[in-house]
Amino acid sequence: MNPMRGAIGCLLGFLAANGCAGEEFFDRVESALSFSAREHQFRARVSGTVDLEAYHYRQVPPGLIYADGDTLFNPRLSLFLDAQYGAHFYAFAQARVDRGFDPSDQGGRMRFDEYALRFTSRGGIFNLQVGKFASVVGNWVPRHGSWENPFVTAPLPYENLVAVWDIAPARSTTQLLNWSHVRPNGLPGAEFTEKRLRSPIIWGPSYTLGASAFGEIGKWKYAVEVKNAGLSSHPEIWGSTEDRWRHPTVGSRIGYRPNPTWNFGISSSTGTYLRPTVAPTFSPGSSLNDHRQTVIASDLSFARHHLQVWAEVYHARFEIPTVADVETFAYYTEVKYKFTPQFFGSLRWNQQRFDRIPNGPLATRWGRNTWRIDVGPAYRFTPHMQLKLQYSFQRQNDAPRNDSHLFASQFVLRF
């Protein structure tokens, strides 16, 4: 039996047997998980999602999926705490129990992905937030949760791994091209083995430590952040403070909303892409500041009636003193259409291209030009349960097997 189908069947059977499928049950849960004190001056609420995901592929696991074999079942429990005191102080936290931040076949574990305190001025013109939380860059991060994201996976800029390692800089052009696997002379299985060492332009929501200031003035929104790690940093170091604040990452976004239909934004970020532990291996005169990732991005969104559209464009430059400043360009366009109050479908086009770098008398691309199309129907059974399906077809230039296919499903229970 398909593990996803069996898990969903068991869950739905449990809900039916206990009379939980009705909205009255979820209303009781919401009431039981909500608290207030001091005449409602202090309010707190616990909420969460249960995600049951299944993936099937016939090649090296795509994106940020880490597993042997060609099928993966990935359950996840996410718990959220929101607390507010008066009109000016707010705190939130997110804890997860799963097999790792990204889908994998490892054992289960628990961790805190987010925790932060926020001060809001009168009118919301100025907000100050301190803690561990998602990046302000782009427009996908605010809707990356399993309930809000119409797809199972992230757009290409957030999960396509490039030939940049965070544990060591490339020492030569030859080494960088070997890491990118654009040459067919690599060892069998090397691409899968090295997968955990590589980085994307931005790793998902990038839950890093730091502080941000943001607000809204008329039709304009602004956000500035100072974080302990760059956008491409790996999840296991997002909470690290070891020698991080000597080389912080600075990011920003300016948004403009001329009317309720359109929303535009420009983002930027700059910081080192290497871990501080790499610094002792540098040659004299070199430092982490010489190995920077600089990102410029633009985004837009459109919403009218049953149609929603999102798009983002990313340009990233990685400074590698022993090679060159290598650049990549990535974008996606995503469309969601609601056919009925419960059924909607989504279509996403993704593409990433890599610049050429000097390679002897020639110039060679330092990565595989890639395009991918994602198709995702979804059905929302109730305001608390939904099922999403996804098919992705991806093509890479210079890959041993150019084409790859991904089938994914995700059942989400929200409470």
Language model features by range: what are they?
Residues 1-24, 151, 156-162:
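Cleavable N-terminal export/targeting peptides
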Residues 223-247, 397, 401-411:
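C-terminal/domain-terminus segments
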Residues 32-56, 67-232, 246-251, 255-263, ...:
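Outer membrane beta-barrel
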